[in-house]
Each structure stands twice: as structure tokens, then as C-alpha cells.
Amino acid sequence: MNNRKAPCLCMDHLTFTYPEQPSPALRDFSLTIRQGEFVVLCGPSGCGKSTLLRQLKRALAPHGKRGGTILFEGKLLGELDQRTESQRIGFVQQSPENQVVTDKVWHELAFGLESLGTDAQTMRLLSLIHI
């Protein structure tokens, strides 16, 4: 019996090139993350960490040419409906100054819940416990 958990995220031969740039920011990158794994992505400034992570959220993905595949829970990322993507894939910036909507991480998370139609009572409860 195989005890390995199914892949949660698979990036296969991912390549990304920004417009009008001669070389890719990401080149032939492959990664599989299984449910429950904890992964640290580190490297020097400008090596492509943010570019890579932004590929996971269509609303945040930079313009450019992408090759390769990204599977999330066995489905092509581009085929997920917006609600599923919003519910299952989060994105919080390292620096509060770079947050998409607000300047506090918990406000950013609450904005995501609000856009999914979470009721006001649940939102208040989460804000009380700073989640």
C-alpha cells in the first residue's frame, strides 16, 4: 500500500518570460507539493520567487508568456472556476506595503472571505480573534 499523499500542487516544466525580455524569469521549473507538506521557497532578490508564486493566482499573474503546466488538486489551474480558486488558493505578501487590498494581513484575509460571501457574523468573529 502506498502511504504517499496525492499531489496538491504540481508545476511541470514551468517557464515564464516577461514581455520584451530576452530570457525567461522562470525556466523549466518543476515542483510537486503533497498535502500536508511544508515548503520554504528562498533565494536572492530577483531570482523569480514572486514571479513563481504569482502564477498561482490568475488575478495576480504578471503579463507575459507562460509554458508548462500547473495542476492544483489534479486539475489544470486555468480550468478552476474563480470561486474555487478564491477558496482554495491564498496569497499574502511578505510586506504589508505590498498587500493587494489592505495594509494588514488579517484584513487581506477578511477581504477574501467577504468576496466569497461570508456572512457578517462570521466576519466579526474572525476579526475578534485576528484571523
Regions picked out by a protein language model, each given a short descriptive name:
Residues N2-M11, T15-D28, L60-H63, E79-D81, ...:
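A short, flexible loop at the N-terminus of ABC-type nucleotide-binding domains that lies
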Residues I129-I131:
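Conserved small/polar residues in nucleotide/adenosyl-binding loops
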Residues K65-L76, E85:
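Conserved ABC transporter NBD signature motif
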Residues E97, T102-E114, R124:
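Short helical segment in ABC ATPase nucleotide-binding domains corresponding to the A-loop/adjacent helical element
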Residues C42-P44:
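The feature captures the beta-strand-to-loop junction immediately N-terminal to the Walker
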